[in-house]
Amino acid sequence: MKKQQAVQDNYDAVIIGAGAGGLATATWLTSKGKRVLLVDDKDKVGGRATSYQIEGFTVNEGAIAIELGSTFEEIMNAVGMQVDVREPSPATVFMVDGKIVNPAKGGWGFLLGGMTKAASKIGAKFADARKGELPDGNISTEAWLKGFTKNKTVHNLFRNFCAAIWAANADELPARAFLTYFGQKGAFKRFGFCPRGTLGIWQDMATGIRNNGGEVWLNAQVQKITLENGKCTGVELTKDGESVFIQASCVVSNAGPKITSQLVGQHNLDAEYMTQVHHRLRPAANIVYNFATQERLIDVPGLVTFANTEYLCNLGELTATCPELAPPGWYLYVAYAVPRPSLSDFAEKSQIEAGLNDLRQEFAGFDDKAKLLNIRVMRGEWPAQRSCSGYDMAIETPISNLWNVGDGVKEYGDGGTQACAIVGKAVAEQVIDYLDA
């Protein structure tokens, strides 16, 4: 390794990690005229929501659906970029006893009415949630639901809601978080798929950053967040075989609170904060099945959530809206399963097989029809979500010019890439306040 070189430029902010949260923060900051450097140790942007090629198919690593009409779109528009997605209609349907149910025709009452006599009581609780009337944060979604019904199909459906949005089981997700999302958040009503793979969205954000004076460095491994007199002074990183010091007035980390604490040095953070890092965060896992068929399995352009499965939670056919993601004559699918448990250790092999069995149950002849492209288990240091909703940490750290972004510091009840966009903008605003003070 060559001798360390100091970068003379002093950035307003250096942002570690070009996943959804880091990109959102960098994009908003550059739109406000701040000098920003976004760095990532991978060879492309997108983090756990990027895309790659397998045998001519464009396959997504994690997230596939990009939400429209809220913060995510606002951030991209701020740097002159449009959200390049195609919106399916209907966006979301449910597979109940082998039949497709479209909830847009009647909402929760319509969806649950054919399953349980308690449908109106459950629906009333969603109305209460919109008014801010929520259960205690210690009761799980499963326990809360048992207060209204024991119907297995209803419980499977709610479990699969939890799995699809938060990569958690109903006995792991607080009911307060569940109802906050469906009662007060966007609840994923409008979304679309990018015809270039989800990577295309992140590449557009990176282009917007560069067009507005920001910089994006890939294959750059941050080794250390540097401190002086209790404040961040920048980062030390390795790029192209050289150790480089980046000076910055602020540091934002999308690496998750655990890795961030290691980069800054746990001895520089107080005991209370480190207790949260070690004991509050609860990473959530899922299993992603990418496969293709030459015969369409189901004629639905959006996402299908299942009501009769134990592990498989939802599925989407990407070629219904974006045929260019697959070679001619092929239909490309992604299905998601969530292990039991999701927030603690599990046996990968048996959980993968359980998800496949659910696919076989829902689609007759699945093994003969489907070409499995890959199966990816998102867990550990590369999880589906860095913390299950209800167990997030704050964006602030004990160091006044160091912040966390991403899905370990979401707003209560939120989930997915949209949650990262919301947090990214919020952190960017705090950085701006700090810089302008």
Where are these regions (language model features)?
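Rossmann-like flavin
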Residues: 111-181, 188-192
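Mid-domain catalytic core of redox enzymes
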Residues: 223-331, 342-343
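Glycine-rich FAD pyrophosphate-binding loop
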Residues: 30-54
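C-terminal structured subdomain/cap of oxidoreductase catalytic cores
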Residues: 214, 221-231, 236-261, 291, ...
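Conserved flavin/dinucleotide-binding core of flavoenzymes
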Residues: 2, 6, 318, 323-437
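N-terminal Rossmann-like FAD-binding beta1-loop-alpha1 element of flavoenzymes
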Residues: 9-38
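Dinucleotide-binding Rossmann-like beta1-alpha1 core, especially the glycine-rich loop
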Residues: 55-134, 147, 160
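Helical element adjacent to the flavin cofactor pocket in flavoenzyme catalytic cores
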Residues: 181-242
